Amino acid sequence: MTKKGKIKTAIIILFSAAVLFAAFSVTGKTLMKLAYPMKYTEYVEKYSGEYGVESELVYAVIKTESSFNPNAVSDADAVGLMQMTPETFEWIKTKLGEEDKDLSLYDPETSVKYGTFFLGYLLDEFENTDTVLAAYHAGRGRVNGWLEDEKISSDGKTLNEIPIPETAHYVKKVNKALNVYNNLY
């Protein structure tokens, strides 16, 4: 093969590799966006702005809690996109001064509004995202008890460990999703 032929072959190989790389990159990103969608954007953006919560955190919680299924129901009877229990829902209604009996956590806007309010409330109370997520999953009272235990919290504000494996796993899953949302969008 001549020098000119070798150069032409090398250029074709490099061009083909570049095209394959670009196609894989686009496909990989597209697949990640399918796995980590941004649904209910109008509600997430509205209420994350209103309650001072990073929208990516709201998406990460929804992804982890219900995988964007507004009809999801957990074993603990938490329902909707953000998986809230009826008791927590009623408590938040009093915090917001709302008495509407027709509100439903199966309604995406209601779920996002109340779940995002609760995340904002927990962020104000605990400040640390891992502690907030533990409280969202295990309950504020339980987490406040953990913070009083010197074996679990050395400063009374941050959890050194999360004593319930299911809650620790939940916090890791939300953080993974949060990392993906922060890097993907």
Model regions: which residues?
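N-terminal Lys/Arg-rich, disordered targeting/topogenic segments
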Residues: 1-6
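Hydrophobic membrane-insertion alpha-helices, especially the h-region
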Residues: 10-26
